[in-house]
Amino acid sequence: MIKKLQTSLIALVVSVFGFFSVPLSTASAADCSVHIGDFDWDSANIHTAIGAYILENGYGCDVQVTKGSTNPILAALIDNQIDIIFEHWTDNNVQLIDPELESGNLVFLGVNTPASEQAFFVDRATSEKYNITSVEDLAKPEIAMLFKDPENPEKGRLTSCISGWTCYTINLVKLKEYGLDDL
């Protein structure tokens, strides 16, 4: 647990990237070994690469990175096989993450991209021209036809997450709940 806490504290400092233009420690790799979990999307890869670089070059840590899909990496983190992840979309795994946070097994260190949201978006010009102000407006047939599905022109099409990602499944449920699954 102490090692996990030390790693968590290092990660907190690492998140303030601007401070690390020169090495801040004379610690050797023997003093610091960190196993980072990385995911299969670009922004996570960037965050992991920056964090790994800082830990290796700024702290002299021995860094191992394991890349994989969300569920296996989270399972390894929860099982203490991985020390830290630098990006996670917690809304997609609330049932898995919240109990681990509550038990103290995982520590949330902060948000690295505060403006990131998961939502349905329409550009301003289209929104203003057709008075689209909420997701419910997308259920109107005349609005749905603005976003025709080229494979089925009788229906509208929304762009979602990559098939296989948790957010894809979440969005399927949302579409059904909003009454958008048959449009």
Placement of each model-derived feature along the sequence:
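Bacterial N-terminal signal peptides
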Residues: 8-22
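Short, well-ordered beta-strand elements
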Residues: 30-43, 61-66, 154-159
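Positively charged n-region of N-terminal signal peptides that target proteins for export
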Residues: 1-5
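A conserved helix-loop-strand patch within extracytoplasmic ligand-binding domains
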Residues: 105-160
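Ligand-binding cleft/hinge of the Venus flytrap
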Residues: 51-59, 137, 142-183
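Pocket-flanking alpha-helical
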Residues: 48, 68-104
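Short helix-initiation/N-cap motifs at beta->coil->alpha
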Residues: 41-42, 62-76, 182-183
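Sec/Tat signal peptide C-region and signal peptidase I cleavage site
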Residues: 22-29
